[in-house]
Amino acid sequence: MDNLRMYGDPPFRVLVAHGGPGAAGGVAPLARELGKKRGVLEPYQTKKTVSGQIEELRETIEKYCSPQVILLGHSWGAWLVYLFAAKYSDLVDRIILISSGPFEQHYASGIMNIRLNRLGAEEKARVEELMSLLSNAELKDREALSEFRKLMAMTDHFDLLEDAERVEVNIDAEIYKSVWTEASEMRRSGELLKTGKKIRCPVLAVHGDFDPHPAEGVEIPLSRILKDFKFRLLERCGHMPWMERHAREEFYRIVEAELDKG
């Protein structure tokens, strides 16, 4: 399967979902590290709808995994595994939400302002130009999305390891545009949070204190609707905890402890 990376040895009971949407390969260092102790899958999301990506994940789990599985999701991937756990609770042991976007719209309104305020005038102008391009319904420009992600990386991270620059991410602008448009509307309408009431498994959210996505936008809404929910805030940490110089060790300690419970 071209859209699947495997780490460690079977049985595969841990799966790591990447962000973006459409940023395949972004969690490879995380999946590889976790795979040193267990079988881990890193699937690439290829479908252009939220439901399509959920079903694609189900097919991967049913074909390659030994349910029940532990699902980790980063950024958009956190929403994906959350939605998956709500629909297919019988397949899931627990989920770990890493650097999730906020679950209610009012928490999301200030994210871009935080990012822009961390940039210089030239970079800020370029981000605004790229945002206009990314809103184009005909967009198929991987280079524009890649440049946008690099500029966001300047604002989203606290102190990244040098290795972060060498992570190969396969950008798909069409997936980003299509899936994010649908997912953000789910948040705006309240459907995203409401769906989580169907989750029956334990949920752990891990978040960096420097991440422009506000931690309270994850902790507060999920605390209201989930029966078994824990939240851990990492200090001096941005949007990619496993690549953060100061938070990496604590991040892996938290995640490994949670995986050992599964």
Give residue spans per PLM region.
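Conserved HGGG/HGGXW glycine-rich cap/lid loop of the alpha/beta-hydrolase fold
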Residues: 2-50
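Active-site loop/oxyanion-hole signature of alpha/beta-hydrolase fold enzymes
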Residues: 41-76, 87, 251
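Conserved hydrolase catalytic core segment
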Residues: 68-111
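Conserved alpha/beta-hydrolase "acid-adjacent" motif
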Residues: 212-218
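Flexible "cap/lid" loop of the alpha/beta hydrolase fold
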Residues: 96-133
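Alpha/beta-hydrolase
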Residues: 128-194, 201
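Catalytic histidine-centered segment of alpha/beta-hydrolase-like enzymes
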Residues: 237-248
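Short beta-strand/loop motif that positions the catalytic acidic residue
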Residues: 199, 205-207
